[in-house]
Amino acid sequence: MAIHPVEFRYGTPEMRVIWEAENKLQKMLDVEAALAQAEGELGIIPAEAASEIVRKASTEFVTLERVNEIERDTKHDIASLVKALAEQCEGDAGEYVHFGATSNDIVDTSNSLLLRDSISVLRDKLTRVLEVLLALADENRDRVCIGRTHGQHALPTTYGMKFAIWADEIHRQLERLDACSERLCVGMMTGAVGTTAALGEEGLEVHERVSEILGLRPVLISNQVVQRDNHAEFIMVLANIATTLDKIALEIRNLQRTEIMEVGEKFDPEKQVGSSTMPHKMNPITAERICGIARVIRSYVVAALENNPLWHERDLTNSSSERIILPEACILTDYILKLTLDVLCNLVFYPENIKRNLEFTGGLIMAERLMAELTRRGMGRQTAYAAVRQCAIEASRTGRSLRDVVLERSEIMDYLTVEDLEEIMNPETYIGSARRMVERVLEESQKWL
């Protein structure tokens, strides 16, 4: 019976299958097979035994049920796997299973295989999010909207700017994921304290050959574990990615507020229900889910950092933690990437509300432009600031437009014509270098994809 939400509610099939118990078992068997192959090639174990171990290192022969049955007695998962594999091997080949290895050689190296596959899935979705954001930036480079600081109307900006800023950040997250992957996905076959003592003089050759067979980079040095700064970095990168998605979703949620309603999630009025009691509700539930799950992913960072300081050459305190945080962090990050794609690919714009919000303050958002233009025409900057500020305060107090108040101020109108003022008060023409900035991101993105 499914209990955890990642089993039935949060997750994608392509990521769940990586972390399913049978696939994890197969990856551990793959490591045992690579060990036997390397030892057979180097003459450490008989070539016939190595071939038999490689042939039987499959869940076709070593079943999850049998491993679990043995573990009920041994209370040790890898010892149970070794016994289950050995009993499937013909002749005396089973006697050579796991020779020279320690349990964590199998665990850490198989985890690297799982994480490599997970990163591939994550990278594909991150790249797709980047592509969608770049397309939105291109399509909306001229869609002027109000920019907000401190929750208040500030200056005009464009939706193209919003999307381009997010695209640039997603690109940095891709770079971080690639960089940490190089350090994280390593092979290890170095024995109980990292010295390869049980393998004799060929120890380092076995270590390197196992990694080569599995397509991994051999770890340079280790004790009984690959050092957990790599795993902590990976979880922090996932938390960072989740936080970027959180930021995007949070902005969309805020822009979907009733009093703003500039953009919003797609809502199916024929089928979708917003509230069990309020028939009118159309809630941003997907964006809210992204934000909620991002909080969970960030919480894994503490556990990942706590897993780095272990006793001496190794203790087991990291193991139980990583059985939870590694699959869950991968599954949940992948899931909210999928949700982000759903939101962005179906984003609805409300142009009339965007225009309404640009005009909401009665021109107060153009105060900076007015001040700057007065300064360019000869009024001192401080004097211009004070004069425009007085007009803005008067407009706010009386509910009149800034334009109407300014028209009555001769000390300002001495520098302007009415036509000048009309142009100054047009928010559509006060977006600075926004268009060029978006174009720069679009041009630079040709190197990213």
UniProtKB/Swiss-Prot annotation:
Q: What does this protein do?
A: Catalyzes two reactions in de novo purine nucleotide biosynthesis. Catalyzes the breakdown of 5-aminoimidazole- (N-succinylocarboxamide) ribotide (SAICAR or 2-[5-amino-1-(5-phospho-beta-D-ribosyl)imidazole-4-carboxamido]succinate) to 5-aminoimidazole-4-carboxamide ribotide (AICAR or 5-amino-1-(5-phospho-beta-D-ribosyl)imidazole-4-carboxamide) and fumarate, and of adenylosuccinate (ADS or N(6)-(1,2-dicarboxyethyl)-AMP) to adenosine monophosphate (AMP) and fumarate.
Q: Which reaction does it catalyse?
A: N(6)-(1,2-dicarboxyethyl)-AMP = fumarate + AMP; (2S)-2-[5-amino-1-(5-phospho-beta-D-ribosyl)imidazole-4-carboxamido]succinate = 5-amino-1-(5-phospho-beta-D-ribosyl)imidazole-4-carboxamide + fumarate
Write out the GO cellular component annotations: cytosol
- Tell me which species this is from: Methanothermobacter thermautotrophicus (strain ATCC 29096 / DSM 1053 / JCM 10044 / NBRC 100330 / Delta H)
Coiled coil start-end: none
The residues that hold N(6)-(1,2-dicarboxyethyl)-AMP are 9-10, 75-77, 102-103, 224, 276, 281-283, 320-324
**How does this protein assemble?**
Homotetramer. Residues from neighboring subunits contribute catalytic and substrate-binding residues to each active site.
Keywords, ordered alphabetically = Lyase, Purine biosynthesis
Its name, as the record gives it, is Adenylosuccinate lyase
